[in-house]
């Protein structure tokens, strides 16, 4: 099944809730802000919120639920974070133990949900500026990589920054920086342009998360901070349980992309 266009955020979430869409959400419900998900027990919530505050590039906070509540009331009233994402990951003691399409049985009265800004949000703006987005063109997930850039520690939370990569034609790199800089609450400007080895990526065609994409002659790899960073942190910190979105399978909010733009 494919999404019809145009589609509202609520319509997209309903299809996802009905398991009619279990694929990555890049290009889905264009114009609506997408978000990364992290779910943790209440006892870890403050430390993780502090981690996000100290690392706003990879972890820009859009909403935080009340303990036990699965409704992100600020960005999508009435939504249910237990069922409204296409695919979830469950980490136990730092190990990825399963992927599933709902987390109803895992969300108890102590769970707190965090929604973090996602770079899929500014892809609509890139396309509107005539800048190609390769993983959308190739109908796959965006490539994501662990880097040698350390995040600022907060309590128990520490680990490497994860970045997403999009190949950009040389002539459009400056424009891509300008366009994405307008969206600081969804990662904003790139954190690196060019040689991936400088940030600890040794094989650009072997991403740690997502899928490899074609890099054509005349294109430069451009890297943005990525909301998959908490998953890399989970592998380092090893909390008893951390639930996240599966990379590329995002939560679609009711916010419009341009609501998060500046200038």
Curated annotation (Swiss-Prot):
Keywords: Lyase
InterPro entries linked: D-Glu_cyclase (IPR009906), Putative_hydro-lyase (IPR038021), UPF0317 (IPR016938)
GO MF term list: lyase activity
Stretches assigned to coiled coil: none
Protein name per its UniProtKB record: Putative hydro-lyase GK2103
Organism: Geobacillus kaustophilus (strain HTA426)
UniProt xrefs under NCBIfam families: PRK05463.1 (NF003969)
Pfam families: D-Glu_cyclase
Keyword Lyase carried by entry: yes
Family designation: Belongs to the D-glutamate cyclase family.
Enzyme Commission no: 4.2.1.-
């Amino acid at each position: 099944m494919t999404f019809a266009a145009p589609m509202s955020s609520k319509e997209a979430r309903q299809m996802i809730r009905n398991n009619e869409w279990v694929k990555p959400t890049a290009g889905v419900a264009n114009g609506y802000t997408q978000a990364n998900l992290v779910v943790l027990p209440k006892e870890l919530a403050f430390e993780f919120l502090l981690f996000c505050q100290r690392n706003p590039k990879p972890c820009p906070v859009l909403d935080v639920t009340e303990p036990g509540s699965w409704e992100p009331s600020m960005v999508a009233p009435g939504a249910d974070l237990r069922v409204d994402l296409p695919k979830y990951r469950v980490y136990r003691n730092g190990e990825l133990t399963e992927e599933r399409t709902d987390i109803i049985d895992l969300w108890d009265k102590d769970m707190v949900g965090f929604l973090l800004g996602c770079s899929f949000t500014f892809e609509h703006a890139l396309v509107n500026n005539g800048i190609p987005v390769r993983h959308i063109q190739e109908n796959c997930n965006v490539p994501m990589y662990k880097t040698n850039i350390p995040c600022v520690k907060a309590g128990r939370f520490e680990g490497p920054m994860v970045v997403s990569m999009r190949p950009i034609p040389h002539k459009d790199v400056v424009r891509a920086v300008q366009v994405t800089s307008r969206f600081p609450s969804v990662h904003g400007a790139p954190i690196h342009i060019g040689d991936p080895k400088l940030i600890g990526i040794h094989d650009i065609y072997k991403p740690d998360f997502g899928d490899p994409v074609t890099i054509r002659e005349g294109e430069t790899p451009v890297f943005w901070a990525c909301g998959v960073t908490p998953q890399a942190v989970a592998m380092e910190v090893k909390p008893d349980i951390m639930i996240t979105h599966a990379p590329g399978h995002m939560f679609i909010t009711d916010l419009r992309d341009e609501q998060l733009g500046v200038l």
